[in-house]
Amino acid sequence: MDDTYTINVTPDKRFSGREIGDIAVAMVVLSIAFVILYRDSQFMWYLGYAYGDVARWPILIVTCFGLVFFSFLLHEFGHKFTAQNFGLRSEFRMSRIGLFITLITSLLGFLFAAPGAVVINGYPCLLYTSDAAVNIVLAMVGIVGCFAFNHTPLVFVFLMLANLNAFLAFFNLLPIPPLDGSKILAWNAPVYVAAMAVAALE
């Protein structure tokens, strides 16, 4: 990858202007990728059945953007605020190549979600489990919501919340550098196996 990650963070500042911009671009690209990925899925069939062929596209787009923004922000907050609790600095940096790969793979029917990475001025591996934990919890919320709101229009939102976050957790835990899974496995194999098992079950 030809992207160069740099970090220049004021210690008492939560987010820099560049980080906010990088997060915004990454969220938009990832949202578009999920819309492309779900375009021929059972989600679209359900939306067409429930709301008609014309309405299903705007509903899918709004839902994907809303859930990706919500899930991605909490995912990155997991990194940032955990790092700050350790007295460390962290910032998200988008990857142009990663964003391109994310879009191209979604067109091919699968998703390699690599919009960027979090740069941390330290290496406490507990930090690398925090974002996956956020996605696992959100997936569980989605599953519970599916049961609680079954046979209502909201079941679609919770089903997509569960599907999207289970995917993000599982993908991020793959033991492939530079994904967090490779760092967690090198740090503590039992923790990695437990986290991956939970993500896979969801």
Where are these regions (language model features)?
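Hydrophobic transmembrane alpha-helices and their immediate loop junctions
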Residues: M1-E202
